[in-house]
A protein has these predicted regions:
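Conserved active-site neighborhood of enzyme catalytic/cofactor-binding cores
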Residues: 15-55
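Single conserved hydrophobic/aromatic residue that forms the stacking wall/gate
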Residues: 1-9
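General beta-strand recognition
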Residues: 12, 22, 114-116
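Long hydrophobic segments that form regular secondary structure
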Residues: 10-16, 107
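Accessory, solvent-exposed terminal regions and/or long lumenal/extracellular loops of proteins
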Residues: 44-164
Length: 167
């Protein structure tokens, strides 16, 4: 039995029931509760994101402190409501155990197509006080794959206070 993959094999992938699933690479939405055959090149891992997810996407970096996350993309996978708590700390010590970290709670209302970015909670030495969030609602051909997007549905300057966005 040869378990090696050829250059373009079709793999069986089970998508759990109770949700829509969005192909990370293409943005195509698929119904859960089924096994699909996904043809993939050898250098691509099939990844499916549950509809109703918010995925923060930072700059490519070799290590956690390599680049500031002052220009962060939020990929919204529509089809259901979503929540995300963005957690940040100093990256390189245990000060988070003493409360040195921040959280920013976010909520996506799929029906109203609104994103709420709540007040930042907490603080730590060297934290970003201001940043830009670039928001993309993922769809086929938009906000897909592991590259950096160049166009966004909306961008907002965030200064730690609640922002409500209609997308």
């Amino acid at each position: 039995n040869d378990n090696t993959l050829s250059l373009h094999d079709a793999l069986p992938i089970y998508l759990p029931a109770g949700a829509q699933w969005i192909d990370f690479w293409t943005g195509k939405s698929l119904k859960g509760g089924q096994t699909i055959q996904r043809e993939v090149p050898i250098d691509i891992m099939p990844v499916y994101v549950r509809a109703g997810s918010i995925l923060p996407w930072g700059p490519a970096a070799q290590y956690s402190t390599g680049k500031k996350w002052d220009n962060l993309t939020l990929r919204i996978y529509p089809g259901a409501d979503a929540e995300l708590t963005l957690y940040e700390d100093e990256f390189d010590n245990y000060n988070y155990e003493k409360g040195a970290y921040t959280t920013i709670a976010m909520k996506w209302n799929d029906k109203d197509r609104t994103l709420t970015i709540n007040d930042r909670q907490g603080n730590y030495k060297g934290m970003l006080k201001n940043r830009k969030f670039n928001i993309i609602i993922v769809e086929p051909g938009k906000g897909c794959g592991d590259g950096d997007a160049t166009t966004f549905d909306q961008s907002v300057s965030y200064r730690g206070k609640r922002v409500d966005l209609k997308l």
